[in-house]
Amino acid sequence: MSPSHAEQFSFFLLSGPDLRIADIAGSGNDAGRSRPHLCDIAYGSPCDLAGATDSNPLLMLTYPPEWVKQYRDRDYFSIDPVVRLGRRGFLPVEWSASGWDSGRAYGFFKEAMAFGVGRQGVTLPVRGPQGERSLFTVTSNHPDAYWRQFRMDSMRDLQFLAHHLHDRAMVLSGMRKVADLPRLSRRELQCLEMTANGLLAKQICARLSISVSAVQLYLASARRKLTVATTSEQLLGPRRSN
């Protein structure tokens, strides 16, 4: 990726802060379509990428531009507790459990809320097939009880969205070559697609007339090819068969 492309892509703002989960995750719930769930969405690859460093990260955001500018100008990457936890771990980081009530982090979160960033938030670490890393965040201004329920109901959709967005960002930015992606066999692809549609291993083996162990082997083989650790990550890998 050339420096000019990295520079163009490093500060891309998505449109509209009034987001609904139905818009991003295909919710079929009428209440979900009528009531805003999220305040902002943010995607960032702050490190371990050619052309994207801590000082020039790959970002797609709906945060207020004034907050984004202040975040970058004051190098908040270095004190943001969510970024620090997300870099080290694999599990979602709930903002309320990220130690934001201590020291500089408290002032950081209070300042973020003053700029209109949601008071609730969860950040999902993403690990790509070529070792790249990114963080995907959604925020909300709903009360604690509502936010907890939304988070439980929507976590799977948010994980799928996080990995899909990461995959597209890597390809469209030129940081990952499509030709470099692994090719899946027909059976591997079938097992992945059925799993993505919610079928269990027993149901897949009945449809394909193969054993449960064979289904598990095909999924494990696909995970190795895509170099991912979980089936959720696997389902967002390249859909190409031999």
UniProtKB/Swiss-Prot annotation:
Domain annotation HTH luxR-type: ranges: 177-242
GO molecular function annotation: DNA binding
Matches recorded under SUPFAM superfamilies: C-terminal effector domain of the bipartite response regulators (SSF46894), Pheromone-binding domain of LuxR-like quorum-sensing transcription factors (SSF75516)
Gene Ontology BP terms: quorum sensing; regulation of DNA-templated transcription
InterPro entries linked to this entry: Sig_transdc_resp-reg_C-effctor (IPR016032), TF_LuxR_autoind-bd_dom (IPR005143), TF_LuxR_autoind-bd_dom_sf (IPR036693), Tscrpt_reg_LuxR_C (IPR000792), WH-like_DNA-bd_sf (IPR036388)
DNA-binding region boundaries: 201-220
Keywords associated with the record: Activator, DNA-binding, Quorum sensing, Transcription, Transcription regulation
Entries under PANTHER family matching the protein: DNA-BINDING TRANSCRIPTIONAL ACTIVATOR DEVR_DOSR (PTHR44688:SF16)
Similarity comment: family membership: Belongs to the autoinducer-regulated transcriptional regulatory protein family.
Protein name in UniProt: Transcriptional activator protein RaiR
Origin species: Rhizobium etli
Top-level taxonomy: Bacteria, Pseudomonadati, Pseudomonadota, Alphaproteobacteria, Hyphomicrobiales
